[in-house]
């Protein structure tokens, strides 16, 4: 393949497909983490291309906190049915028994117990030795320094000072028993790359990414969409209809919407071209403590 003849997006696509095939061939029991967001949708599309016309040689895993948007659950189930892939859904039952939720316990504890511990439980339960994730280096500073092959110890912890070199797209996947890796095929993509690829490939995504009137309240400068009756209204808070969309998706009480008129993919791309803020500005879990994301990754977060 002559890379000089490939467009920028074609080069990114080829690199990602190479990584996915490499991991599938090298590891005994890989899995693809499926968070239902735009990056997961792109990664799933790339995986289907990588093994077409065959089926995916690994399952998809959704670590469900019980607090995702209803439209995310509907999209997840519809996608699994349409494509026919194996979907594993894991929930931290101990956390649910403790009544852990983002309103009472805060974003840090909720994320640690329901997402990080839930993920570690699932990886241990099924014995996965490699897990694909849709994280990108342009999202956040700790992810910017993480390798494509991100090695984790027996406790799933990440040590940023103990990473292997990745020269000329050569990846060292040797691990000891009990260790594992997280793999990020979209590492070199940007948010704009993702949206342009979604547009060109006509990839189906959750409707929450498109602007429309939605019930929201403003809390500490963040627009929170009220998705069900579990909302914990504070004195003076008022729910109103505003035209908003989401640049990133997570648990609905911890995910801020942005004011927008972008109702189509071209309009979203145009919005991205003039944006000066990170898509993760709306993720409250990224700012719940100092060096929040790196600390979470050291503890086993994806």
Swiss-Prot record:
Top enzyme category: transferase
InterPro entries reported for this sequence: PAPS_reduct_dom (IPR002500), Rossmann-like_a/b/a_fold (IPR014729), SO4_adenylTrfase_ssu (IPR011784), Sulfate_adenylyltrnsfr_sub2 (IPR050128)
GO BP annotations listed: hydrogen sulfide biosynthetic process; sulfate assimilation
Repeat listed as a keyword: no
Pathway the protein contributes to: Sulfur metabolism; hydrogen sulfide biosynthesis; sulfite from sulfate: step 1/3
Coiled-coil segments: none
UniProt-listed Enzyme Commission number(s): 2.7.7.4
Enzymatic reactions: sulfate + ATP + H(+) = adenosine 5'-phosphosulfate + diphosphate
GO molecular function per UniProt: ATP binding; sulfate adenylyltransferase (ATP) activity
Pfam families: PAPS_reduct (PF01507)
HAMAP family xref list: Sulf_adenylyltr_sub2
NCBIfam families per the UniProt record, alphabetical: CysD, PRK05253.1, PRK12563.1
Free-text function comment from the UniProt entry: With CysN forms the ATP sulfurylase (ATPS) that catalyzes the adenylation of sulfate producing adenosine 5'-phosphosulfate (APS) and diphosphate, the first enzymatic step in sulfur assimilation pathway. APS synthesis involves the formation of a high-energy phosphoric-sulfuric acid anhydride bond driven by GTP hydrolysis by CysN coupled to ATP hydrolysis by CysD.
Recorded family membership: Belongs to the PAPS reductase family. CysD subfamily.
Protein name: Sulfate adenylyltransferase subunit 2
């Amino acid at each position: 393949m002559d890379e000089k003849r490939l467009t920028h997006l074609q080069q990114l696509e080829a690199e990602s497909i190479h990584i996915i095939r490499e991991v599938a061939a090298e590891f005994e029991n890989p899995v693809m983490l499926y968070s239902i967001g735009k990056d997961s949708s792109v990664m799933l599309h790339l995986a289907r291309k990588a093994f077409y016309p065959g089926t995916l040689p690994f399952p998809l895993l959704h670590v469900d906190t019980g607090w995702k948007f209803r439209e995310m659950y509907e999209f997840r189930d519809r996608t699994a049915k349409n494509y026919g892939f194996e979907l594993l859904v894991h929930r931290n039952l101990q956390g649910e028994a403790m009544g852990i939720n983002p309103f009472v316990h805060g974003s840090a504890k909720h994320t640690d117990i329901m997402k990080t511990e839930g993920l570690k439980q699932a990886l241990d339960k099924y014995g996965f030795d490699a897990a694909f994730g849709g994280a990108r280096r342009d999202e956040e500073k700790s992810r910017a320094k993480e390798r494509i092959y991100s090695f984790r110890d027996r406790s799933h912890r990440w040590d940023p000072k103990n990473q292997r070199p990745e020269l000329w797209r050569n990846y060292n996947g040797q691990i000891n028993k009990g260790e594992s890796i997280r793999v990020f095929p979209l590492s070199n993509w940007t948010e704009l790359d993702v949206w342009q690829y979604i547009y060109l490939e006509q990839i189906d995504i959750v409707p929450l990414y498109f602007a429309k009137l939605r019930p929201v309240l403003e809390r500490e400068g963040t627009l929170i969409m009220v998705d069900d009756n579990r909302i914990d209204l504070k004195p003076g808070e008022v729910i109103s209809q505003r035209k908003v969309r989401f640049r990133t998706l997570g648990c609905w009480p911890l995910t801020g919407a942005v004011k927008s008129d972008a109702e189509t993919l071209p309009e979203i791309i145009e919005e991205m071209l003039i944006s000066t803020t990170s898509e993760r500005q709306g993720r409250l879990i990224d700012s719940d403590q100092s060096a929040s994301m790196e600390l979470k990754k050291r503890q086993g977060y994806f």
